[in-house]
């Protein structure tokens, strides 16, 4: 399947644009002075390509790095140095895709996915195959803390997936149940549901889908314990018909967040501590291959609003939002470009960087409360994908 879609496999990348003011009605943004300049630092690798998926307020970055043998491990960058987080016994961990994962909190706790040494007895591709090479092994969510990677339990099935962690150490994602669901899209066999893990108390809580749906998955959690994710059919997590509805779980209640008018691919990617949600949604007429997704911002006051894209592009995704209301993501045409939405204005991040910088800022996946951004750039000299941190330089009058 062709998927320019960043959540599944960003095979195509998006064209450039310039600063654009959004013309459709939008939810309000808190006032932030637009940065006049960003300094971009490229981070070291473990010997191969890399990308950043999350950045916390101390400026630490979680993501993945390739190794010289071609395998890929989850990684944590602290103060310019890289740490290999290892695996759960398999060959690979971390995520290769345009998502804001692995999750990382302000204490440096990382949540993500890893292959294990065990084989999947049902021959499922599971969600991991969308994010790293499928090898027939069971894939589980993990929490990494204090130098130790620990597997998170499933709901009775074989596979699991961790996507986000808040400062209380509560982790969200999705996991298989023991239920064989005949409606699943092959090769998926088992039903999967959204999960809230609380490792400190060893509690695992299933988060139900909307009434009438069979499947759910959670993608992010904020400091207040509000969780966002998807509800739908047993298809490809976290997209296609599995994402028939974008949802919010809050104090035991699941709420439909609406859509931009299409039938599927309505996927929240992040929620800030004010409860503002960003992600992507199919517009009317959108197809199953998600070639024309639209970035959205959802607020309780304004509902879901289309954030637009760079001129000439056909797809956009909002991947993270900080507590100041700044949003980062991608806008895609022939190639993808990292973008920033701020005060109702869409910026191509490259336009805010020193012209002498020669890399292609391919994606912006995460932004902290200081405005630092991480994601993936392409080194124009070597063609290698690398993790970057863009730090705003605020000019005082």
Predicted regions and their residues:
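Positively charged n-region of N-terminal signal peptides that target proteins for export
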Residues: 1-4
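C-terminal motif of bacterial Sec signal peptides marking the signal peptidase cleavage site
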Residues: 12-15
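Residue-level hotspots at or immediately adjacent to binding/recognition sites across diverse folds
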Residues: 17-397
